[in-house]
Amino acid sequence: MTKVITYGTFDLFHEGHYRLLQRAKALGDYLIVGVTTENCDRARGKLNVVDDLMTRIENVRKSGFADEIIIEETIGQKASDVQKYKVDIFAVGSDRIGNFDYMEDYCKVVYLERTKDVPSTMPQNQVFKIQRIGIIGTGRIAGRFLKEAKCVSGSSVQGVYNPHKESAELFATKYEIDVFNTLEELYKKAEIVYVASPHETHYEYVKDALEHDKHVICEKPFVLSKTQAKVLFDIAKQRNRILFEGIKTAYCPGFTKLIEVARSGLIGNIRYVDACFTKLENKESRELTDIQYGGSFLELGSYCLLPIIKLLGCGHGEISYDSICDERHIDLFTKASLRFPKGLATITCGLGVKSEGRLLVAGTKGYIVAEAPWWKTTYFEVHYEDASKVEKYSERFWGDGLRYEISDMLNQINGNHKSEFKLTEAESIIMAGIMEEFLEKRKRGNICNI
């Protein structure tokens, strides 16, 4: 008798789960299915599990393919299960190719073809449905988003659109998803649109998606003018759609905790915020070759503006910019100084100059410091006048962090609006206005001073 084992969360049981179990069963005579506990999922960074364990087990049983159901409670359990149950074949979806090659030491490993087109319709007894996602854009961030979406229960990436069809086909082949030849095709297969196209195209793509009654996550920078941002949020409200800017930092637990501590009064009144984010980018990258919309500030400025706006407010005054530019006037390094009614702030961004990146929040009783990469906040400290008094905070940060914004989008779609404070409409509008101001000053030659 050939024994096969496979594992999964099997949350919001859908056709993709059914087909996986069907294919696994066909590999042998006896199928063991491991259903993962919510605690185990959390430990490996999977978010948003909706159904309780017993419901998920019952759905697997009802499929009719499982001869035996076990519970996966700990990371690392798979190898011991294979030995315990004398398993011959370990089966897993093809989206995990390479991840379980180590299991070849214990049994044969088979990667099963995944179901690309997961339907959004659900059994009648389920309250929430699978939210299908369509991606616009095929750059690096789109690939990271797709991988992160797999770690959020209740979502399924259906396919990708790029007006350059060859790029879309290469991307779709790499990630085993469909290609949408038109936006209309995408809209028919998705409830959520993720816009990861070049900066200057965001407005038209977001507007079109909203007008087709889609929820939208748009990569930073959201749009490049204050007016455009207002128009898009107005459309979202009129259509009763969820719209937010995808600055991953805003949604991660560590950054949320940092903002809470800063606002709590622990360091007194906040008077100064200094945010620095630099990285050395490839000289041939889009960021350093796009004369109109490339450069450090447009690429990294949103990250630095985020803590400043959240802690000092939306009512900034004059902003001064100083940049080091190349011969094409693309800023390799930009330093911006902002004035607020009750505080000051500085931003430092660089793609061609490396500096010590950190976030500093200074108050009348103490200060908070988070070292690089603070935009993936896992650790920060609170310091006081008494140097011996240091308070330390830490949080997990999973993967690339995009799973947190996907999770928040699903929560809001399902009626839980408690996370709206993480990045508000007003904050995104203000940041869009600052991007607009920067572009205007750069166009007039008032920025590239060095």
Regions found by a protein language model. Give the residues of each.
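Nucleotidyltransferase catalytic core that binds NTPs
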Residues: 1-129
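N-terminal Rossmann-like dinucleotide-binding module
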Residues: 129-174, 444, 448-450
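Predominantly a Rossmann-like dinucleotide-binding segment in NAD(P)-dependent oxidoreductases
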Residues: 249-319
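Beta-loop-alpha module in the N-terminal Rossmann-like domain of NAD(P)-dependent dehydrogenases
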Residues: 145, 175-233
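Rossmann-fold dehydrogenase core element
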Residues: 231-248, 269-273
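Contiguous beta-strand/loop segments that form the cofactor/metal-binding neighborhood of enzyme cores
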Residues: 305-379, 406-416, 449
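C-terminal helix-rich "cap/oligomerization" subdomain common to oxidoreductases
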Residues: 172, 185, 192-195, 408-450
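Hydrophobic residues in well-ordered beta-strands that form the structural core
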Residues: 33, 181, 218-219, 243-245, ...
